[in-house]
Amino acid sequence: MKVGIIGSGGREHSICLSMKKSSKVDKIYCFPGNAGTSEIAENISIDLENHQNIKDFILDKKIDLVIIGPEKPLVEGLVDYLEKFKIKTFGPNKIASKLEGSKIFTKKLCQKYNIPTARFGIFKNKRDAKEYLNNSNFPIVIKADNLASGKGVYICENKKNGYIAIDEIFNGKFGEAKNILIEEFLNGEEMSFFTIHDGKIFKNFGTAQDHKRVLEGDRGKNTGGMGAYSPSRLINDELKKKIIEKIIKPTLQGLKDHGSEYKGFLYTGLMIVKNEPYLIEYNVRMGDPECQ
Protein backbone atom coordinates (compact mmCIF):
# COMPACT_ATOMS: atom_id res chain seq x y z
CA MET A 1 0.00 0.00 0.00
CA LYS A 2 1.28 3.46 -0.95
CA VAL A 3 0.47 6.38 1.37
CA GLY A 4 0.78 10.10 0.70
CA ILE A 5 1.04 12.51 3.64
CA ILE A 6 0.51 16.21 3.01
CA GLY A 7 2.28 18.73 5.25
CA SER A 8 5.68 19.79 6.56
CA GLY A 9 5.53 19.89 10.36
CA GLY A 10 6.28 17.71 13.35
CA ARG A 11 2.71 16.43 13.08
CA GLU A 12 3.38 15.02 9.62
CA HIS A 13 6.66 13.49 10.77
CA SER A 14 4.74 11.74 13.56
CA ILE A 15 2.13 10.42 11.10
CA CYS A 16 4.92 9.17 8.82
CA LEU A 17 6.50 7.31 11.75
CA SER A 18 3.19 5.63 12.56
CA MET A 19 2.63 4.64 8.92
CA LYS A 20 6.16 3.24 8.77
CA LYS A 21 5.31 0.79 11.58
CA SER A 22 2.43 -0.73 9.60
CA SER A 23 3.09 -3.96 7.72
CA LYS A 24 0.44 -2.84 5.20
CA VAL A 25 2.44 0.21 4.08
CA ASP A 26 5.13 -0.34 1.44
CA LYS A 27 5.88 3.25 0.41
CA ILE A 28 5.36 6.70 1.97
CA TYR A 29 5.43 10.01 0.13
CA CYS A 30 5.39 13.27 2.07
CA PHE A 31 4.69 16.54 0.31
CA PRO A 32 6.49 18.75 0.86
CA GLY A 33 7.82 17.08 4.04
CA ASN A 34 10.82 18.15 6.12
CA ALA A 35 14.29 16.97 7.15
CA GLY A 36 12.82 14.43 9.56
CA THR A 37 10.38 12.91 7.07
CA SER A 38 13.16 12.55 4.49
CA GLU A 39 14.60 9.71 6.59
CA ILE A 40 11.39 7.63 6.52
CA ALA A 41 9.54 8.85 3.42
CA GLU A 42 10.20 10.31 0.00
CA ASN A 43 9.80 14.08 0.18
CA ILE A 44 8.08 15.63 -2.83
CA SER A 45 8.34 19.34 -3.58
CA ILE A 46 4.81 20.37 -4.62
CA ASP A 47 2.97 23.64 -4.11
CA LEU A 48 0.09 22.72 -1.78
CA GLU A 49 -2.10 25.37 -3.38
CA ASN A 50 -1.79 23.69 -6.78
CA HIS A 51 -4.44 21.01 -6.39
CA GLN A 52 -4.07 19.79 -9.97
CA ASN A 53 -0.35 19.04 -9.58
CA ILE A 54 -1.05 17.18 -6.33
CA LYS A 55 -3.76 15.13 -8.05
CA ASP A 56 -1.53 14.35 -11.04
CA PHE A 57 1.29 13.14 -8.81
CA ILE A 58 -1.03 10.93 -6.73
CA LEU A 59 -2.52 9.30 -9.82
CA ASP A 60 0.87 8.90 -11.50
CA LYS A 61 2.37 7.13 -8.47
CA LYS A 62 -0.83 5.13 -7.83
CA ILE A 63 -1.02 6.27 -4.20
CA ASP A 64 -3.72 4.33 -2.35
CA LEU A 65 -4.43 6.71 0.55
CA VAL A 66 -3.79 10.41 1.15
CA ILE A 67 -3.68 11.86 4.69
CA ILE A 68 -3.87 15.65 4.92
CA GLY A 69 -2.07 17.08 7.95
CA PRO A 70 -2.53 20.88 8.06
CA GLU A 71 -5.78 22.86 8.14
CA LYS A 72 -5.25 25.21 5.19
CA PRO A 73 -5.58 22.61 2.39
CA LEU A 74 -8.64 21.17 4.14
CA VAL A 75 -10.36 24.56 4.43
CA GLU A 76 -9.50 25.27 0.78
CA GLY A 77 -11.30 22.10 -0.32
CA LEU A 78 -8.45 19.76 -1.27
CA VAL A 79 -10.42 16.71 -0.07
CA ASP A 80 -13.40 17.63 -2.26
CA TYR A 81 -11.12 18.08 -5.27
CA LEU A 82 -9.22 14.79 -4.85
CA GLU A 83 -12.38 12.79 -4.24
CA LYS A 84 -13.72 13.92 -7.63
CA PHE A 85 -10.98 11.71 -9.08
CA LYS A 86 -11.84 8.80 -6.74
CA ILE A 87 -8.68 9.35 -4.67
CA LYS A 88 -9.11 7.94 -1.16
CA THR A 89 -8.46 10.83 1.20
CA PHE A 90 -8.48 11.02 4.99
CA GLY A 91 -9.69 14.42 6.14
CA PRO A 92 -12.89 16.50 6.28
CA ASN A 93 -14.43 18.12 3.22
CA LYS A 94 -14.78 21.87 2.74
CA ILE A 95 -18.11 22.18 4.57
CA ALA A 96 -16.93 20.22 7.61
CA SER A 97 -13.64 22.12 7.62
CA LYS A 98 -15.55 25.32 8.35
CA LEU A 99 -15.52 24.13 11.98
CA GLU A 100 -11.97 25.49 12.02
CA GLY A 101 -12.09 27.79 9.00
CA SER A 102 -14.71 30.05 10.58
CA LYS A 103 -15.04 30.47 14.34
CA ILE A 104 -18.33 32.28 13.74
CA PHE A 105 -19.71 29.28 11.79
CA THR A 106 -18.91 27.10 14.79
CA LYS A 107 -20.42 29.54 17.29
CA LYS A 108 -23.66 29.68 15.32
CA LEU A 109 -23.69 25.88 15.24
CA CYS A 110 -23.31 25.88 19.03
CA GLN A 111 -26.19 28.32 19.33
CA LYS A 112 -28.50 26.26 17.12
CA TYR A 113 -27.71 22.85 18.64
CA ASN A 114 -27.37 23.94 22.29
CA ILE A 115 -23.68 23.10 22.52
CA PRO A 116 -22.15 24.59 25.69
CA THR A 117 -19.75 27.43 24.86
CA ALA A 118 -18.82 30.90 26.06
CA ARG A 119 -21.34 33.70 25.49
CA PHE A 120 -20.34 35.75 22.47
CA GLY A 121 -20.99 38.65 20.13
CA ILE A 122 -20.21 39.05 16.42
CA PHE A 123 -19.10 42.45 15.11
CA LYS A 124 -18.61 43.74 11.56
CA ASN A 125 -16.55 46.87 12.26
CA LYS A 126 -14.11 48.42 14.73
CA ARG A 127 -16.57 50.97 16.09
CA ASP A 128 -19.20 48.47 17.19
CA ALA A 129 -16.59 46.08 18.60
CA LYS A 130 -14.94 48.82 20.65
CA GLU A 131 -18.29 50.12 21.85
CA TYR A 132 -19.06 46.62 23.12
CA LEU A 133 -15.76 46.58 25.03
CA ASN A 134 -16.67 49.85 26.74
CA ASN A 135 -19.47 48.01 28.56
CA SER A 136 -17.70 44.67 29.13
CA ASN A 137 -16.03 42.98 32.06
CA PHE A 138 -12.39 41.91 31.77
CA PRO A 139 -10.59 39.70 31.01
CA ILE A 140 -12.34 39.10 27.70
CA VAL A 141 -11.49 37.00 24.62
CA ILE A 142 -11.24 38.44 21.10
CA LYS A 143 -10.87 36.15 18.08
CA ALA A 144 -10.24 36.50 14.38
CA ASP A 145 -12.92 34.59 12.46
CA ASN A 146 -10.63 33.00 9.88
CA LEU A 147 -7.53 30.79 10.01
CA ALA A 148 -4.65 32.31 11.95
CA SER A 149 -2.25 29.40 12.62
CA GLY A 150 -3.27 29.33 16.27
CA LYS A 151 -2.36 32.99 16.79
CA GLY A 152 -5.72 34.71 16.21
CA VAL A 153 -6.97 34.53 19.82
CA TYR A 154 -6.37 37.43 22.21
CA ILE A 155 -7.02 37.21 25.94
CA CYS A 156 -7.37 40.88 26.85
CA GLU A 157 -6.92 42.02 30.45
CA ASN A 158 -8.15 45.57 29.83
CA LYS A 159 -9.81 47.86 27.30
CA LYS A 160 -6.49 49.09 25.87
CA ASN A 161 -5.40 45.56 24.99
CA GLY A 162 -8.85 44.91 23.53
CA TYR A 163 -8.62 47.95 21.26
CA ILE A 164 -5.20 46.77 20.02
CA ALA A 165 -6.58 43.30 19.24
CA ILE A 166 -9.55 44.74 17.34
CA ASP A 167 -7.29 47.04 15.32
CA GLU A 168 -4.84 44.25 14.44
CA ILE A 169 -7.57 41.88 13.28
CA PHE A 170 -9.53 44.42 11.23
CA ASN A 171 -6.29 45.84 9.78
CA GLY A 172 -5.60 42.44 8.20
CA LYS A 173 -3.03 40.79 10.45
CA PHE A 174 -4.64 37.41 9.69
CA GLY A 175 -5.96 38.26 6.23
CA GLU A 176 -9.12 40.09 5.28
CA ALA A 177 -11.45 40.37 8.27
CA LYS A 178 -15.16 40.89 7.65
CA ASN A 179 -16.17 39.94 11.19
CA ILE A 180 -14.70 39.64 14.65
CA LEU A 181 -15.75 37.46 17.57
CA ILE A 182 -15.78 38.69 21.17
CA GLU A 183 -16.62 36.20 23.90
CA GLU A 184 -16.65 35.90 27.65
CA PHE A 185 -13.58 34.62 29.44
CA LEU A 186 -14.22 31.20 31.00
CA ASN A 187 -12.30 30.65 34.21
CA GLY A 188 -11.31 27.01 34.07
CA GLU A 189 -8.63 24.71 32.66
CA GLU A 190 -8.09 23.85 29.01
CA MET A 191 -8.17 20.32 27.64
CA SER A 192 -7.88 18.88 24.15
CA PHE A 193 -10.13 15.93 23.25
CA PHE A 194 -9.39 13.94 20.09
CA THR A 195 -11.70 11.78 18.01
CA ILE A 196 -11.18 9.92 14.74
CA HIS A 197 -14.07 9.62 12.27
CA ASP A 198 -14.86 7.60 9.15
CA GLY A 199 -18.04 9.47 8.19
CA LYS A 200 -20.31 7.01 10.03
CA ILE A 201 -18.80 6.23 13.43
CA PHE A 202 -16.11 7.78 15.60
CA LYS A 203 -13.72 6.69 18.33
CA ASN A 204 -12.09 8.66 21.12
CA PHE A 205 -8.43 9.15 20.28
CA GLY A 206 -7.15 10.36 23.65
CA THR A 207 -6.68 13.71 25.37
CA ALA A 208 -3.90 16.25 25.88
CA GLN A 209 -3.14 19.52 27.58
CA ASP A 210 -1.60 22.12 25.28
CA HIS A 211 0.35 25.17 26.45
CA LYS A 212 0.01 27.97 23.90
CA ARG A 213 1.44 31.11 25.54
CA VAL A 214 4.88 32.11 24.29
CA LEU A 215 6.37 33.04 27.69
CA GLU A 216 6.89 31.23 30.99
CA GLY A 217 4.13 31.41 33.59
CA ASP A 218 1.34 31.31 30.98
CA ARG A 219 2.20 34.83 29.80
CA GLY A 220 2.49 36.46 26.40
CA LYS A 221 0.64 35.94 23.14
CA ASN A 222 -0.81 32.64 21.93
CA THR A 223 1.15 30.42 19.56
CA GLY A 224 0.24 27.24 17.72
CA GLY A 225 1.56 25.37 20.77
CA MET A 226 4.75 25.61 22.85
CA GLY A 227 4.35 22.12 24.28
CA ALA A 228 1.82 19.51 25.35
CA TYR A 229 1.41 16.43 27.49
CA SER A 230 -0.98 13.50 27.19
CA PRO A 231 -3.28 12.32 28.66
CA SER A 232 -4.86 15.31 30.36
CA ARG A 233 -5.12 14.86 34.13
CA LEU A 234 -8.65 16.34 33.94
CA ILE A 235 -10.29 13.49 32.04
CA ASN A 236 -12.62 11.02 33.78
CA ASP A 237 -15.46 8.77 32.62
CA GLU A 238 -18.20 11.23 33.57
CA LEU A 239 -16.49 14.13 31.78
CA LYS A 240 -15.81 12.00 28.70
CA LYS A 241 -19.51 11.11 28.45
CA LYS A 242 -20.51 14.79 28.77
CA ILE A 243 -18.10 15.82 26.01
CA ILE A 244 -19.43 13.19 23.62
CA GLU A 245 -23.13 13.70 24.37
CA LYS A 246 -23.20 17.49 24.77
CA ILE A 247 -20.57 18.56 22.24
CA ILE A 248 -19.37 15.94 19.73
CA LYS A 249 -22.70 14.33 18.80
CA PRO A 250 -24.66 17.62 18.39
CA THR A 251 -21.82 18.96 16.23
CA LEU A 252 -21.92 15.92 13.95
CA GLN A 253 -25.70 16.31 13.67
CA GLY A 254 -25.24 19.95 12.75
CA LEU A 255 -22.79 19.04 9.99
CA LYS A 256 -25.15 16.32 8.76
CA ASP A 257 -27.90 18.94 8.51
CA HIS A 258 -25.48 20.99 6.39
CA GLY A 259 -25.05 18.00 4.07
CA SER A 260 -21.70 16.82 5.39
CA GLU A 261 -20.51 13.74 7.28
CA TYR A 262 -17.26 14.17 9.19
CA LYS A 263 -14.22 12.14 8.17
CA GLY A 264 -10.75 12.57 9.64
CA PHE A 265 -9.28 13.73 12.93
CA LEU A 266 -11.32 16.13 15.06
CA TYR A 267 -9.52 18.12 17.73
CA THR A 268 -12.00 19.55 20.24
CA GLY A 269 -10.57 22.41 22.29
CA LEU A 270 -12.36 22.64 25.63
CA MET A 271 -12.48 24.68 28.80
CA ILE A 272 -13.35 22.54 31.80
CA VAL A 273 -15.20 24.44 34.52
CA LYS A 274 -16.13 22.38 37.61
CA ASN A 275 -16.12 19.15 35.56
CA GLU A 276 -18.39 20.71 32.92
CA PRO A 277 -17.05 20.98 29.33
CA TYR A 278 -17.38 24.15 27.25
CA LEU A 279 -16.34 24.26 23.60
CA ILE A 280 -13.60 26.81 22.91
CA GLU A 281 -12.80 25.84 19.33
CA TYR A 282 -12.51 23.02 16.83
CA ASN A 283 -9.48 22.04 14.79
CA VAL A 284 -10.20 19.78 11.83
CA ARG A 285 -6.85 17.98 12.06
CA MET A 286 -4.47 16.69 14.69
CA GLY A 287 -2.64 19.28 16.74
CA ASP A 288 1.03 20.05 16.50
CA PRO A 289 2.69 19.39 18.99
CA GLU A 290 -0.09 17.11 20.37
CA CYS A 291 0.20 14.61 17.51
CA GLN A 292 3.86 14.07 18.31
Regions picked out by a protein language model, each given a short descriptive name:
Residues M1-K94:
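ATP-binding N-terminal substructure of ATP-dependent carboxylate-amine bond-forming enzymes
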Residues I5, C30-F31, I67-I68, T89-P92, ...:
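General beta-strand structural signal in soluble alpha/beta enzymes
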Residues S38-A41, N53, K98-I104, L215-G217:
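Short, charged, surface-exposed secondary-structure boundary motifs
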Residues N43-E49, G121-N125, C156:
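Short acidic-hydrophobic, aromatic-tinged amphipathic segments that line or gate anion-handling sites
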Residues I58-I63, N135-S136, G175-E176:
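Glycine-rich phosphate-binding loop signature in dinucleotide/nucleotide-binding domains
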Residues F90-G152:
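A conserved helix-loop-beta module that forms one wall/lid of the active-site cleft
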Residues G152-C291:
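Internal nucleotide-binding/catalytic subdomain
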